[in-house]
Amino acid sequence: MEIPIAEELAKKQKSISVAEFFEKNRQILGFDSAPRSLITTVKEAVDNSLDACEEAGILPDILVQVERTGQDYVTVIIEDNGPGIVREQIPKVFAKLLYGSRFHALKQSRGQQGIGISAAVLYAQMTAGRHTKILSKTGSNVPAHYYELMINTSTNEPDILMDEVRDWFRPHGTQIELEMKAAYVKGRRQSIYEYLKATAIVNPHARITLIDPDGNEEVFERATDKIPDPAEEILPHPEGIELGTLMKMLHYTERQKLAPFLRYSFCKIGLLTADEICKAAGLDPEIDPHALGRHEARKLIEAFQKVKIMSPPTDCLSPIGEELIYRGLEKETNVDFIATSTRKPAVYSGNPFVVEVGLAYGGNLPKEEKISIMRFANRVPLLYQQGGCVTTHAVEDIRWKQYGLNQPGGGVPIGPVLLLIHVASINVPFTSESKDAIADIPVIKEEVDLAVKEVARKLKHYLSKQSNLKKRREKEIIITKVLPKMAVKVANILEKDVPDINPVVAKIMGNLLVYRKVKSNGDGTADVAIKVKNFGTSAHSFRVHEMLPCKINGAKPEPKVVTMDNDYDYVWDVSAAAGSSKVLSYKIESATVEELRKLPQLIVEGIEEELVTGAKAFRGV
């Protein structure tokens, strides 16, 4: 008798493990080319290191080393000073897909699914046929544990090839070494160097060292010793819950009554709100949640929309902050102007999120190319699929011409600008498992739009100010060319000394005039007066620096003193209203006439040089 075709087909059907699935679909996780595979591996390891260090309250110190081991193969070593991993967990952490501690935690974190580093181990054994080496230590008084691991793709379980105790110089930390088919590239935005540079900008508390295949070492120093505030885990918010998820929660809850179930299973639901929800759903607050079916669960979902429930708490987020974004950009770029913005937290589908933006302008950034957009999600750089990301779409939709940048044909504008956009959330809505781009969620796009426009307005103000300063500079150049010639001619006619033209220039320009008057007393002492006159129409606050090789006496007002080897920097904090004058005086006890004649130029800190006459000036930070 002929066997039915259905039975023949049934014999061929079998389940596959998640490891087998990703073994045949590695491109889903970002292992689709030789250069990208290396970047993805480094990214996953560095993410783990940063998360572990921050959770343990340790300032991260991370080493990334890449060595060529063949024409198409590299060995990559990532080492950190984190808390280490206990011996029993090492094989599962590195050689079991979908194994981790953050999947169910509702708080901001870099890694979540428990796939990343295990996928790198899987890729290494697939392409190079080699095991992965792990060394980890949890404290200075315990030995380090060394493992050599591979993944059994049929069972998604670790194969332990070696397990032994070793000595290690680090008091605590973890090291992973993988050999794989990959390529180390330079000079691209999508490279290990650019990835680590971007990581250093948004993680200014981390120190990251890169040793490339040629032995060159690049250190991205930390800009702060402050570890980010830890993100707190929160309960799910009713706004974003789905029917199936709610039914599962009702089925598995330990609560015996509906009202307590609502209070202790969701955030921002108190006693009164729970009663309101039950009333809106037409359900008894005392009913056993296990007895509720699909129909009742749907009523609860509808009640969540009817009852006013507070937004979820935002302590589950850990934004970078405007000051540290500024420091990160300042540390890793050479630019003329930096502006930052951190928006207030917002919510999409019950998930709190916050958008932060930094803008750097000028310096050595290319002037005739499209602006650079650096995208980040939960402090992790997004290097690929820029065109498919909501952050890029928000930038493209802004009319940049009104902010001083050209935008021929629309889209990304042209100019010497680096735009940093960071989205932090407990659940970043990526477009794919490879986490390359953020989905087009309207409220996220709106927040990005508002944050970018805020820094764009600051840029517009800066460019307008620079334009005005340029005009002043051109005007002053003309004046300083004409006036001296006039002064010489008038002095010759009147048979008098050529006068100092600085007061006249300052008055014409509306500048701040700063100059020194020295009166020698004939006994080796001298009285010095630093005179300040504000000819402008607005007030100025600034610092006056007097750099001298000797000590002074009788200073009025008393300056701050900074000692530098054999020299002294006397610093006065000065505020000068429009049209006002100030005098800073002091006495020098012993100085020759020649020394008095060679006193260094006064320095004014806090004002653009175009607004000051008679002294050297700089704006400062």
From Swiss-Prot:
<feature type="binding site">
    <location>
        <position position="435"/>
    </location>
    <ligand>
        <name>ATP</name>
    </ligand>
</feature>
<keyword id="KW-0547">Nucleotide-binding</keyword>
<comment type="function">
    <text>Relaxes both positive and negative superturns and exhibits a strong decatenase activity.</text>
</comment>
<feature type="binding site">
    <location>
        <begin position="101"/>
        <end position="102"/>
    </location>
    <ligand>
        <name>ATP</name>
    </ligand>
</feature>
<dbReference type="InterPro" id="IPR005734">
    <property type="entry name" value="TopoVI_B"/>
</dbReference>
<dbReference type="GO" id="GO:0003677">
    <property type="term" value="F:DNA binding"/>
</dbReference>
<dbReference type="GO" id="GO:0005524">
    <property type="term" value="F:ATP binding"/>
</dbReference>
<feature type="binding site">
    <location>
        <begin position="111"/>
        <end position="118"/>
    </location>
    <ligand>
        <name>ATP</name>
    </ligand>
</feature>
<feature type="binding site">
    <location>
        <position position="48"/>
    </location>
    <ligand>
        <name>ATP</name>
    </ligand>
</feature>
<dbReference type="Pfam" id="PF18000">
    <property type="entry name" value="Top6b_C"/>
</dbReference>
<dbReference type="InterPro" id="IPR014721">
    <property type="entry name" value="Ribsml_uS5_D2-typ_fold_subgr"/>
</dbReference>
<comment type="similarity">
    <text>Belongs to the TOP6B family.</text>
</comment>
<dbReference type="InterPro" id="IPR036890">
    <property type="entry name" value="HATPase_C_sf"/>
</dbReference>
<dbReference type="Pfam" id="PF02518">
    <property type="entry name" value="HATPase_c"/>
</dbReference>
<dbReference type="InterPro" id="IPR010979">
    <property type="entry name" value="Ribosomal_uS13-like_H2TH"/>
</dbReference>
<dbReference type="InterPro" id="IPR015320">
    <property type="entry name" value="TopoVI_B_transducer"/>
</dbReference>
<protein>
    <recommendedName>
        <fullName>Type 2 DNA topoisomerase 6 subunit B</fullName>
        <ecNumber>5.6.2.2</ecNumber>
    </recommendedName>
</protein>
<keyword id="KW-0238">DNA-binding</keyword>
<dbReference type="GO" id="GO:0015935">
    <property type="term" value="C:small ribosomal subunit"/>
</dbReference>
<dbReference type="Pfam" id="PF09239">
    <property type="entry name" value="Topo-VIb_trans"/>
</dbReference>
<comment type="subunit">
    <text>Homodimer. Heterotetramer of two Top6A and two Top6B chains.</text>
</comment>
<keyword id="KW-0799">Topoisomerase</keyword>
<dbReference type="GO" id="GO:0003918">
    <property type="term" value="F:DNA topoisomerase type II (double strand cut, ATP-hydrolyzing) activity"/>
</dbReference>
<dbReference type="InterPro" id="IPR040494">
    <property type="entry name" value="Top6b_C"/>
</dbReference>
<dbReference type="GO" id="GO:0006265">
    <property type="term" value="P:DNA topological change"/>
</dbReference>
<keyword id="KW-0067">ATP-binding</keyword>
<dbReference type="GO" id="GO:0005829">
    <property type="term" value="C:cytosol"/>
</dbReference>
<dbReference type="InterPro" id="IPR020568">
    <property type="entry name" value="Ribosomal_Su5_D2-typ_SF"/>
</dbReference>
<keyword id="KW-0413">Isomerase</keyword>
<feature type="binding site">
    <location>
        <position position="80"/>
    </location>
    <ligand>
        <name>ATP</name>
    </ligand>
</feature>
